[in-house]
Structure formats: C-alpha cells, structure tokens
Swiss-Prot record:
It is an enzyme of class 2 (transferase). It is found in: Cytoplasm. Belongs to the MnmG family. TrmFO subfamily. Keywords: Cytoplasm, FAD, Flavoprotein, Methyltransferase, NAD, NADP, Transferase, tRNA processing. This is Methylenetetrahydrofolate--tRNA-(uracil-5-)-methyltransferase TrmFO. Its EC number is 2.1.1.74. Its cofactor is FAD. Catalyzes the folate-dependent formation of 5-methyl-uridine at position 54 (M-5-U54) in all tRNAs. The keyword Methyltransferase applies. It catalyses: uridine(54) in tRNA + (6R)-5,10-methylene-5,6,7,8-tetrahydrofolate + NADH + H(+) = 5-methyluridine(54) in tRNA + (6S)-5,6,7,8-tetrahydrofolate + NAD(+); uridine(54) in tRNA + (6R)-5,10-methylene-5,6,7,8-tetrahydrofolate + NADPH + H(+) = 5-methyluridine(54) in tRNA + (6S)-5,6,7,8-tetrahydrofolate + NADP(+). GO terms for molecular function: flavin adenine dinucleotide binding; tRNA (uracil(54)-C5)-methyltransferase activity, 5,10-methylenetetrahydrofolate-dependent. It comes from Streptococcus pneumoniae (strain ATCC 700669 / Spain 23F-1). Its main location: cytoplasm.
Length: 444
C-alpha cells in the first residue's frame, strides 16, 4: 500500500489518541473532524476529546482495573492521560478533569503537532486505498454509519446512555450539604446531600413517576449499565439506588451536622453526591444521575434533593443513542478490520465502554496503523495487561450476546497458581504482573 500519510476519522478521545500516536512515530496524519462543519446533538464545542457524559476518568489506584489501564497508558505516552493529569480537579481517589480545560489542551497538543493536518469536514465514505483509523464514536454521522453498517453484516447494534445535570455551585444551600470523600479517601472532594428515610421515599416516588422525554417508537430501550438513567434504576427498586449512586456507606454525618436525621444514626439513609466539574469549582455535576427526564421534570424532582431546592441547572441531563460494531466477527485483536484490511477501528464503536477505554483503543489502533504503514508486523498486547485484555475481550466475546464492556479484572488473564482470596491483594498482584509484562513487551 503506497501512501504518504494515514487518515484518522474523528477527533474524540480515541481519534485524538490515535492521531497523536501515529504522528509521534514520524508519520504524517490527516485528522478529519466534522464538528465545525456539522454539529452533533450532544457536543457543545468544536474541541477535540470533548467529554459529553461525566468529567471523571474514574479510579486512579492500581487495585482498580481502570487505574491499571491508565498507568499502562501513561507508560505508552498517552496524550489523553498527559492532558488529564494537567487539568485534574479534586475527586478523592478518582481522576476527574476540568471538562473544558481538558479538551482544550488535547486540541492544542494535536493541532500544534507538526505532522498532524486537521481537516474540518464530514467523511461519508470509508477509504479503500489509504490506511485509516475510523474513530467516529457512538455519534457517527448517518452517512458514514450506513457504510459501517454494511461492513457490520447489516446488523444494527446500539444502546442508550445519558449525561447527568450540571449545577451552579452558588445556588447550592451549603448549610444542608457537607464536604467528604467516601471512607475519607484522598481529599474531601464531594459535596454530599444526605437524606432521611422519609426524604428518600418521597424522592423515589417522585422519580419513578416523573415524565421521560420520548424515544423513537421503533427503537427499544437498551441501556449500558455503567451510564443508566437514574429513573430506570429507580424503577428497578429502592435497593438499586441505595446500593448504587445513592449509597450512604462511608459518608457519615460530620460532627457539626445539625440537619434532619433518622434518630441517632451516624450515617444518612441515602446520599446524593455532587462532584466538581471545572477547575474554578463553580460547577458541580450530580454523580450517577444520568437522566432522560424532561427538563421541567428534572428541575422539579432534583430540587427535592436537600440543598438543591433553589439550584440553577447550567445543563440538564440528556440521553443519546450509541452505536457499536460486531467486533468479535469484524475486528482483529490489533483493532484492524477483518473485512477491509486498510481500516482500523477505535473507540466506543468497537464495544469498549468508557472514556479511558476509548482512548486506550485509539492508542493501540494508532500504534498498529503506524506499524502497518512502516510494513512492520502489528502488535498484540499481552492478555495479562489491561490494555491487552480489553482488545482480547471485544474480539473474542460471544458475538450473539456481545455488549459494550468496561475494563475490569474479570477480563484480565487469571494469575497462575492458587487463587489469592483477599481481593485487594489479588488485584495488586495482577497489576504488578501487568506492568512487568508490559515493560518486558516494550523491550522486545
């Protein structure tokens, strides 16, 4: 394949990472991004790597699978992780970022790279004669989605996910909330709105009866568990919320708390957490409260949360449809297409779920596209690593039941020998092995 550059289509997390990895290997890149010419319903800016759901990149500890994945990516020179570290905001044991600052930094690093040419245009055909990384994301334009659909054996895979509302911090009644991270992990980074049992029951009742925005009648409601609307959780039952986003464990009342409580209990019946959304600390999002309620209903129901009675919503929650491919049948473990060998795919459309996972897939696809360009053999990362196990999972899962997957220790190759019973100790060992295997892999 004679060519002088590689195409990357889409400048989200995966596309930005792929383009950067290719350029860092000395190969010119044409990076196509349609925003600026054509917008999507969910994106608010024309910046690259815009975060449309939460501003959290989740746990940072190596005993957390996504924490391990991030450490592997750091060692591989990820531009997404570098930008995230530079724009992080307080979030306890998690890595959360200033939403706008993060995407602005990624944009600047990519746009200013001497080997990356940014083309603001919509691509409607899949190239056949140029090595191309397709990373158009779950919000792929209709024209290109049709071409991918044809590659996808005509099967339409999709699910819905949603974003949580964002609130002006100056409109939160601080006398009714308290600052704390769960189990006092890291710095006190979350505002916590405690509820008594009666307050929770009233809130739950209002939530399950609130009016949702309509879906297209021909589409079934299929949600990804990690980004499920709060009203859908509520309809599954009270325990789903109390063991999920409103879990009170580790969020005891502070000693100076004077608000309502159930008797002498030290822990609230339920807690709503709010997380800082920007570096200035002027915006907070309601953690785990992705929603598809009508905007008026969001205001009515969420203002029942203690401290949010007069809250001003800077952005209401929204829901969008995400599409993904039949990766077990269509992709190699290198993220290369089995059907059209000049193509690589990356990001959520491949069935990896989550910001970090999307960027990781872009990193691997970019490395392998660069290797193909140089006529070198592509690389498959070890299944003992988080980055390798994710690629293995999406390309080896049962196609009939394939659904998007977050990175987790369950998909990473088991440790040899007798199973370590203590979960933390087991995860530490898995992480230790992963980083050692990655180091060895990179030196071969």
């Amino acid at each position: 394949m004679s060519q002088s550059y590689i195409n990357v289509i889409g400048a989200g997390l995966a596309g930005s990472e792929a383009a950067y990895q290719i350029a860092e290997r000395g190969i010119p890149v044409k990076l196509y991004e349609m925003r600026g010419v054509k917008s999507t319903p969910q994106h608010k800016t024309d910046n690259f790597a815009e975060l449309v759901c939460s501003n959290s990149l989740r746990g940072d500890a190596l005993t957390n699978a996504v924490g391990l994945l991030k450490e592997e990516m750091r060692r591989l020179g990820s531009v997404i992780l570098e930008s995230a570290e530079a724009t992080r905001v307080p979030a306890g044991g998690a890595l959360a970022v200033d939403r706008d600052g993060f995407s602005q930094m990624v944009t600047e690093k990519v746009v200013n790279h001497p080997l990356i040419e940014v083309v603001r245009d919509e691509i409607t055909e899949l190239p056949t004669d140029v090595i191309t990384v397709v990373a158009t994301g779950p919000l792929t334009s209709d024209a290109l989605a049709e071409k991918i659909h044809a590659l996808n054996n005509g099967d339409g895979f999709y699910f819905y996910d949603a974003a949580a509302p964002i609130i002006d911090v100056n409109t939160i009644d601080m006398s009714k909330v308290y600052l704390k991270s769960r189990y006092d992990k890291g710095e006190a980074a979350y505002l916590n709105a405690p509820m008594t049992k009666q307050e929770f029951m009233d809130f739950h009742e209002a939530l399950v009866n609130a009016e949702e925005a309509p879906l297209n009648s021909f589409e079934k409601e299929k949600y990804f568990e990690g980004c499920m609307p709060i009203e859908v959780m509520a309809k599954r039952g009270i325990k789903t919320m109390l063991y999920g986003p409103m879990k009170p464990v580790g969020l005891e009342y502070p000693d100076d708390y004077t608000g309502p409580r159930d008797g002498e209990f030290k822990t609230p019946y339920a807690v709503v957490q709010l997380r800082q959304d920007n570096a200035a600390g002027s915006l907070y999002n309601i953690v785990g409260f992705q929603t598809h309620l009508k905007w008026g209903e969001q205001k009515r129901v969420f203002q029942m949360i203690p401290g949010l009675e007069n809250a001003e919503f800077v952005r209401y929650g929204v829901m969008h449809r995400n599409s993904y491919m039949d990766s077990p049948n269509l992709l190699e473990q290198t993220y290369r297409s089995k059907k059209q060998p000049n193509l690589f795919f990356a990001g959520q459309m491949t069935g990896v779920e989550g910001y970090v996972e999307s960027a990781a897939s872009g990193l691997v696809a970019g490395i392998n596209a660069a290797r193909l360009f140089k006529e070198e053999s592509e690389v498959i990362f070890p299944e003992t690593t988080a980055i390798g196990s994710l690629a293995h999972y999406i390309t080896h899962a049962d196609s009939k039941h394939f659904q998007p997957m977050n990175v987790n220790f369950g998909i990473i190759k088991e440790l040899e020998g007798e199973r370590i019973r203590d979960k933390k100790a087991r995860y530490e060992k898995i992480a230790e092995r992963a980083l050692a295997d990655l180091e060895e892999f990179l030196t071969v």
